[in-house]
């Protein structure tokens, strides 16, 4: 195996030397061709220069008739130069293309050789005899592992992707999970402590409110101080509000309901509002009638239809004729006067209506026709 590897290495070296010598030869040949092309161009240019000089001397003796021929010659020369330049450029391009092709072919050949060598070495290693000692097989397997690992390391260094950090006995992901679990446990403990404190405060407030509702708020606060419990400003405020509620209840007889916040409701104002509500919504008694109500009930317009309409509009219940007959003399006189007044008003209304509808062109109404109103 070692001998075959050594022979393969020597064969690769000879091939690389042959390739380099071939490349140098091809480059020298191309340089020579390029220099020869340049020399030819220089000779052509020098010859063209001499020809030009001679032609100028000849043409100086000639007249203006040959000016057109000169311009044609110049055009022909410029075209020939351009053609030569384009030819030289095309040659250079062809040479560069041929070089690139040669390189590609050499690369493909070297790849094919490498593949063949690998396949041969694999086939030989597969078909080896199995009767050799275990120590030799182990040493060979170690050598193979080393050879396989070397190009892999080289390829990893060439690759752009960063390699993962080596394992040094501690896993960072597991450490992060453990830290998170510890934080969660601490947060749970803190939350439980806060809940306990809140429950204790609520109990203290309820005790203080209950003690204040009984009436002896100051005594209860003193008792709490004597017992050693801490009296917070909230407890003191609740006791004060309970004392105010007890005072309002004693004066007005109206207590503030439990669903109201005692710190936000004034008990005296609440009692006044409740009194007003009761007066508004309580039912009227039968015997209580004011004088104005009696006058409106006994009002008479001199016409039964008008009386019925008025009572319906005002919400007055109709009384019996027997009740109406039993009336005092004073009330009877007032009713008579009301009837006369309403009759006069009706007559005046009819007169005004007839004048406004029939005599429109009589001015603003302050004429002799309005004198009849006084006589009525």
UniProtKB/Swiss-Prot annotation:
There is a cross-link at residue 317 (Glycyl lysine isopeptide (Lys-Gly) (interchain with G-Cter in SUMO2)). There is a cross-link at residue 317 (Glycyl lysine isopeptide (Lys-Gly) (interchain with G-Cter in SUMO1)). The modification Phosphoserine is found at residues 45, 318. Keywords: Coiled coil, Isopeptide bond, Phosphoprotein, Ubl conjugation. Residues 53-155 have a biased composition (Basic residues). It comes from the Eukaryota. Residues 171-214 form a coiled coil. Residues 13-52 have a biased composition (Basic and acidic residues). Belongs to the RSRC2 family. This is Arginine/serine-rich coiled-coil protein 2. The gene is Rsrc2.
């Amino acid at each position: 195996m070692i001998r075959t590897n050594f022979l393969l290495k020597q064969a690769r070296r000879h091939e690389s030397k042959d390739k380099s010598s071939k490349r140098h030869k091809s480059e020298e040949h191309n340089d020579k061709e390029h220099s020869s092309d340049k020399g030819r161009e220089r000779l052509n240019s020098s010859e063209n220069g001499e020809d030009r000089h001679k032609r100028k001397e000849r043409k100086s003796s000639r007249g203006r008739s040959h000016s057109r021929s000169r311009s044609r010659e110049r055009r022909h020369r410029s075209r020939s130069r351009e053609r030569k330049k384009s030819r030289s450029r095309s040659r250079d391009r062809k040479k560069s293309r041929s070089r690139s092709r040669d390189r590609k072919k050499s690369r493909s050949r070297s790849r094919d050789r490498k593949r063949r060598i690998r396949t041969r070495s694999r086939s030989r290693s597969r078909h080896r005899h199995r009767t050799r000692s275990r120590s030799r097989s182990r040493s060979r397997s170690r050598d193979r592992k080393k050879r396989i690992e070397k190009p892999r390391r080289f390829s990893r260094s060439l690759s752009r992707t960063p390699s993962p950090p080596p394992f040094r006995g501690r896993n960072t992901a597991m450490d992060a999970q453990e830290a998170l679990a510890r934080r969660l446990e601490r947060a749970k403990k803190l939350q439980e402590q806060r809940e306990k404190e809140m429950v204790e405060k609520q109990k203290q407030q309820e005790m203080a409110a209950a003690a204040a509702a009984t009436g002896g708020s100051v005594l209860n606060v003193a008792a709490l101080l004597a017992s050693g419990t801490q009296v917070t400003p909230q407890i003191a405020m609740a006791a004060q509000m309970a004392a105010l509620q007890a005072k309002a209840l004693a004066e007005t007889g109206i207590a503030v309901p439990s669903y109201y916040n005692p710190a936000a409701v004034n008990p005296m104002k609440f009692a006044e509002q409740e009194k007003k509500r009761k007066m508004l919504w309580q039912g009227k008694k039968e015997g209580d009638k004011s004088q104005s109500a009696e006058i409106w009930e006994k009002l008479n317009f001199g016409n039964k239809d008008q009386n019925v309409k008025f009572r319906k509009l005002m919400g007055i219940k109709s009384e019996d004729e027997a009740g109406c007959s039993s009336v005092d003399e004073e009330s009877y006189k007032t009713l008579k006067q009301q009837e006369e007044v309403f009759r006069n008003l009706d007559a005046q209304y009819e007169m005004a209506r007839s004048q406004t509808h029939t005599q429109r062109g009589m001015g603003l109404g302050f004429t002799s026709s309005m004198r009849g109103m006084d006589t009525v």
